[in-house]
Design a protein with these regions (language model features):
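Extracytoplasmic small-molecule ligand-binding "clamshell" domains
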Residues: 22, 28-102
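Periplasmic-binding protein-like
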Residues: 41, 123-134, 206-245, 264-289, ...
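Acidic, polar ligand-binding/catalytic clefts
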Residues: 64, 75-142, 283-292
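Short beta-strand-to-loop elements that line the ligand-binding cleft
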Residues: 74-86, 170-178, 218
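Ligand-binding clefts/hinges and TM-proximal coupling segments of bilobed small-molecule sensing domains
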Residues: 30, 158-174, 212-214, 246-299
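Extended ligand-binding regions for polar small-molecule ligands
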Residues: 61-69, 141, 146-147, 152-154, ...
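A ligand-binding cleft/hinge motif common to bilobed small-molecule-binding domains
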Residues: 89, 104-114, 159-166, 185-188, ...
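Bilobed "Venus flytrap"/periplasmic-binding protein-like clamshell domains
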Residues: 36-45, 55-72, 107, 125-179, ...
């Protein structure tokens, strides 16, 4: 009996130790010699691919700065690996340790905070509507009877439903597996509109075959804090990420990175999104925080 209890105690200790290590990113990457960044294929200027395994963008570059400091904390150079994630799998892959830091376009909300942790907000998004330029659609009320695209696993799905109930507009939702797929639904005529984060819409329009064929219209549907995501219960890594962002904000480098990706010409086509930082984004930089979207709604 004593041997059995001793074995159970050892097993419990090993399990708790393994759990602690799984949530200790600094220890994890120090032991493995590598860190995995979760990136997106088409999340506007926040995170996108150039092909051949190359990923760039505002959040990708901020994550690279965080990883620079992670290497200092680990005391070694790390092999940086990239894993393409989607709106559906980004949280599970972060939770299970496949991804160490997710650098895409994830909205910080209360439900997600129960599963993962977020760094200080680095971008405050405005949810908008993209349509074909010749559609005649200028606001959400004109979507009655239309097919409206959004991306599976994003908060825009809930937002669409709330607007449908609030305004009495009866539209059919069609879902893309990722943002590029959702834009393709609009581009091909299978959807009459695409509702998503404004910079994602602008990025997909800018990189389309005929940017002049599309436009962003209507009122701002919602304001959402977008942040870099990682595992919960890892205070040391959260502090490292937050301290990195705080230093970038204090030095003015964060504003320069924003200008680089949202105002200036970006690869691969040297297109310009021309999206100057909103007052909400500047406010997030001035008063760094990790508040969820619900806190913004209460204002």
């Amino acid at each position: 009996m004593k041997k059995h209890l001793f074995a159970l105690a050892i097993a419990s200790l090993l399990a708790s130790t393994a759990f602690a290590q799984a949530n200790d990113t600094i220890a994890k990457v120090k032991a493995s010699g590598s860190v995995t960044m979760g990136v997106r294929d088409s999340s506007g200027a926040l995170s996108y691919t150039l092909g051949d395994g190359k990923y760039v963008g505002y959040h990708v570059e901020i994550c690279q700065r965080i990883i620079d400091n992670l290497e200092k904390a680990a005391g070694k150079k790390l092999d940086v690996k990239y894993t393409s994630v989607t709106s559906q799998n980004r949280i599970p892959l972060t939770e299970n340790g496949t991804v160490d830091i997710e650098c895409g376009s994830t909205t910080n909300n209360e439900a997600r905070q129960k599963q993962v942790a977020f760094a200080f907000t680095t971008f405050v998004e405005e949810v908008r509507i993209a349509v074909r330029a010749n559609s005649g659609i200028t606001n959400i009320a004109q979507l009655n009877g239309k097919n409206v695209a959004t991306t599976t696993g994003t908060t825009s799905v809930q937002l669409l439903r709330k607007n449908e109930r609030a305004t009495g507009v009866d539209f059919k939702e069609v879902f893309g597996k990722d943002h590029a797929d959702s834009f393709l639904l609009l581009e091909s005529g299978r959807a009459d509109a695409f509702v998503m984060d404004g910079q994602i819409l602008a990025g997909n329009i800018a990189n389309s075959k005929a940017p002049g064929d599309f436009k962003i219209v209507g009122e701002v549907l919602n304001v959402e804090p977008i942040a870099i995501m990682f595992r919960k219960d890892d205070p040391a890594f959260k502090k490292l990420a937050d301290d990195t962002i705080a230093a970038l904000a204090k030095s003015g480098e964060l504003a320069k990175l924003y200008d680089k990706w949202f105002v200036q010409a970006i690869p691969p086509k040297n297109t310009k999104l021309g999206l100057t930082a909103s007052d909400a984004t500047k406010g997030a930089w001035a008063n760094l925080n990790d508040k969820p979207v619900e806190a913004y709604a209460k204002k």
